Amino acid sequence: MKKMKKAVYLILFSVLTANSQVMENPNTIMSLAPVEQLALTQEWDKVFPKSDKVDHRKVTFVNRYGITLAADMYTPKDAAGKLPAIAVSGPFGAVKEQSSGLYAQQLAERGFITIAFDPSFTGESGGRPRRVASPDINTEDFSAAVDFLSVLPDVDSSRIGVLGICGWGGIAIQTAINDPRIKATVASTMYDMTRVAANGYFDTDNSAEKRNAARASLAAQRTEDYRNGSYKRAGGVVDPLPTDAPQFVKDYHAYYKTPRGYHPRSGNSTDGWNVTSILPLMNFRFFEYAGELENAVMILHGEKAHSRYFGEDTFKLLCGDNKELLIVDGASHCDLYDNLDKIPMDRIAQFFSKRMPAE
């Protein structure tokens, strides 16, 4: 009898121990990653004035890769009931204190709950090393913002949209292709970052020879980075400005390198991306399934924007009668960063309201 009891105890102990080992084994954890406690600036440090028509607070959420993202949330004052919501990000290399925050605040004034978030590895968000770009992780960032908004008690989860500016305009559309929870998408003054990375501006470097030369240079830089134990930075917007700089480079300088848009956490304002961040963008192509995007899209560009061809070519890939292309008379690429006389904010709000109607 004693031997039988001992055997039962041994079996029970082994089962409990096995369960304990499974529970403590990090390779078997299936729950969401914990939200990292980020050091968030509490004072108003945006490049635009604070509105008295909305409430503002900092929020954090985690993406599917376990990276904690930081965002500014803007809510209409005296909001009642469940409201439609919009996640905003961009431009590429910028932070939420710049253009994306301005858009988010403006749309909150028009009745939406909005968040402007810093992408992974950028600004106040988590992720190491800093200033790394990834077409996969960055599209995931937008979907993670939708995750977060979907479970807020004040948000109508059937009425969530996204808005991307500059390089994040292309990322917004790419995310919407894969995430049907996004009912409406606006891409403002958009870039296709995969196209410009692989082909250069205006497709002037679109050849196997030039891409292979770029790959060889970047691969060599990887070796140097690993040897040095740190990543070489690409540099932000050029400064001082060469006298023969193209007009669009002058426009970037006028935004990122002056009090108008400079922010110390913005890579475009300071020392830029890691040089090798361009590699995954060269090896990836957005919009392969653009024709399958059923939900609504608005692409808007300035008439004079150097980036206009990205938006017009992407628009041709979209199908359905819920897609819109809006060209803003007389506007440049950077006018749609912060020039409220040029940005058709009411048209954008009307688009979201029309394409995300209350049920």
Regions found by a protein language model. Give the residues of each.
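Alpha/beta-hydrolase-fold enzymes
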Residues: 173-257
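Catalytic histidine-centered segment of alpha/beta-hydrolase-like enzymes
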Residues: 331-342
